[in-house]
């Protein structure tokens, strides 16, 4: 049952259109909105004093100093403005913006608009991304404070290019601005990770950058910090608010919806209270809400290539003001066939050309295709290669078990029971189970749930809302088992995953490395278990070589399968070469000037190596050789 005050408000709303038609502008179109916590209270009888909340009756009487209010306290017009001049409110008569709306008028004070240059200040009503809520379960706790920094001490780093700025050992050494430094403190970032130590000073200096570092090593902050800091230092004059076209100053492209959302969430934390607005746009979600967000203003746009092309073709986004361009997981974009779209966005739209904008390209691996694309987009760039954190021996324990297809579910059940028994307070540790098919993911999820193991799944047939819900449920521990396919989980940063189980082994050793890299992140230890049987014989040799290089114990039966699969010669997709380099790529500008043939005869690290040459040494990544002595495999610990 509604209160008398709520009834009067409803009646006023129903009668307002007719009254407005009869009397023109002589009275308020409709009564002000009554917040739920004020409903059921009697309207104050006394007239409002200066600075007090006006009564409902007083609000209905228009005046020059206090215009009529549509929407009421939603825009903080009356509540924040006070009496006298009154806080102007959007939707009232236009005199309000001059009389009280901007903070003047008889001690009114600022309403939705304030006295700062540029009008609306987003910081006044910006949602706090640091607020404790269900959505923020593990977002901050332990991401940097939980990093095993000792594992970073011996990490190899290479840079190439002229006049490389020196690395920074602490965030205090970098001039990022007070507001951003405060957000870094609130994120509990103790000190920069290796990629941040080198990449942030390079970007702050205005240089283009190609950075090769594993996912989970702090790449998002490495490109977000310089972008936010740069926008804060040299913000252009505000554009007309009436335009339906958004003019972002920075564009961050990523290959998947989930990764775009992930980057957006992190960037919002970094940009909190800086006045820098971050908006995300991706497919699979209604475009109307994204358009509304863009119309409210945007400095940093995080987008997938497909949705961005849609916005550009609708003329709802213009790239002519872009000062910063960042591509995250660039190798994945090429894998997923985005190169034509990226080239069109960067080269054929209204984006400023290279040299007039700053471009940062981040990837876990840099084979020739990525570097060729990068050289088209970058001007006088610095190449940065950051090796893996420690060795797999220290971080990820790999186990391979021979399990027939018919026995996989029972074996999985045994693993989960043992894991639960050994877990803290009998709780299930976060476990990621990879399968090959979408149907298999759904079936395994239902089977686990019916057997007492809370599980959820993520794959390409899930709606965006379902995928986001599943990830939140998994990260929070509500459903500590996530069944996933490769494509759906690629690029996601899921902290605290203790165990990765390859229920179905992939056909490619690259995908195996992507999968097990979901654990052992940020210098922490992890466990990876794989179910192997006759159908996986083509993977036996590269899997055996991988485990040997990582100083893992290789079962004798797997060595026999490896010897059988390599009988009569090797080569092909899964053939790898040994070595010791530990990077995800090598600057191809160096290789062009050295012997060895093609791009990179002289060796490479993770995914490095030769393109047409004889293949070089490689740790995870081997001597990749397109047309040469067997392909190395990318170390995309992605």
From Swiss-Prot:
Catalysed transformations (reactions): ATP + H2O = ADP + phosphate + H(+)
SUPFAM superfamilies, alphabetized: P-loop containing nucleoside triphosphate hydrolases
Biased composition (Basic and acidic residues): 119-128, 584-593
Regions of compositional bias (Low complexity) in chain numbering: 1-21, 40-67
Domain Helicase ATP-binding: 200-384
Helicase C-terminal domain sequence ranges: 411-562
GO molecular function, one term: ATP binding
InterPro entries recorded: DEAD/DEAH_box_helicase_dom, Ded1/Dbp1_DEADc, Helicase_ATP-bd, Helicase_C-like, P-loop_NTPase, RNA_helicase_DEAD_Q_motif
Ligand binding (ATP): 213-220
UniProt-listed Enzyme Commission number(s): 3.6.4.13
CDD domains the record matches: DEADc_DDX3_DDX4, SF2_C_DEAD
Pfam families hit by this protein: DEAD (PF00270), Helicase_C (PF00271)
Biased composition (Gly residues): 79-112, 567-583, 594-632
Keywords (A to Z) from UniProt: ATP-binding, Helicase, Hydrolase, Nucleotide-binding, RNA-binding
Locus of motif DEAD box: 328-331
GO cellular component: nucleus
Motif (Q motif): 169-197
Chain segments carrying region Disordered: 1-129, 565-638
Enzyme class: hydrolase
PANTHER family: ATP-DEPENDENT RNA HELICASE DBP3 (PTHR47958)
Comment field on protein domains: The Q motif is unique to and characteristic of the DEAD box family of RNA helicases and controls ATP binding and hydrolysis.
Protein family: Belongs to the DEAD box helicase family. DDX3/DED1 subfamily.
Protein name: DEAD-box ATP-dependent RNA helicase 52B
Lineage: Eukaryota, Viridiplantae, Streptophyta, Embryophyta, Tracheophyta
